Amino acid sequence: FIICANNLGSCYGTTGPLSINPETGKAWFSDFPTITIRDMANALELLKKELKIEKIHTVIGSSQGGQIAQEWAIMFPGNTNNLILIATNCVHSSWGIAFNESQRMAIKADPSYGENTDEGGAAGLQVARSIALLSYRNYATYDVSQRERRKKTGYKAAADYQQYQGEKLVKRVNAYSYVRLSEAMDSHDVCRNRCKNHEAGLHKIKANTLVIGVTSDILFPIEEQQRIADSIPKANFATIDSLYGHDAFLIETEQ
């Protein structure tokens, strides 16, 4: 059977900022504790034990999910037979952290973020989504995907697309979860407080591993996946050749 679990801090059912703080009887909102990728991996291990699963056939993780999958495999070696890591890294880059901080700045610049309501920070979250899209795609992606729209609607096609994506996200994600999840991504470092270098951290992974990178990914450059594959003892490396950047793993399903 297949299990797709919500991550700690998310807004899809697992404990997160809209959950009730037992000490106050009210939702956490911006007071929700800072969490790390390792916290998320520990939460998945608790779920595994609750479901009485002794061994996992395959763990699949992409982007932040790939970060969690690595930590899970390092913290609990022998947990899974196989590991598939897609468009991810072993330590979150300064480039990625800068993108995440820019998004958080946009959210916190929205005065409603400090009001601690379900809709708090919604306008800022729309801007954050627009910033994020620029890192998920690239110049060629926009040039190709907006070409036909631009012929029909004029030069505002790309601008309208950014607005649309921002409006769509706020219908399913709250700003407080977005902030905490992005902070967790920034914390990712398989070497932190456990080894001298990242290669040594990755060497602890015992599972058969397939690492997949996207040729045009500017957020998680393909060199980051190659580094992972080179450092895990039983790893193979593959690529998705696409102009869709980081989002290619969601789009290029045939590959």
Regions found by a protein language model. Give the residues of each.
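Short, conserved loop/helix-junction motifs that constitute active-site signature segments
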Residues: L202-K206, S231-I232
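Catalytic histidine-centered segment of alpha/beta-hydrolase-like enzymes
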Residues: A238, L243-E254
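Active-site nucleophile elbow and catalytic-triad environment of alpha/beta-hydrolase enzymes
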Residues: Y164-Q165, R180-G201
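Conserved alpha/beta-hydrolase "acid-adjacent" motif
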Residues: I218-E224
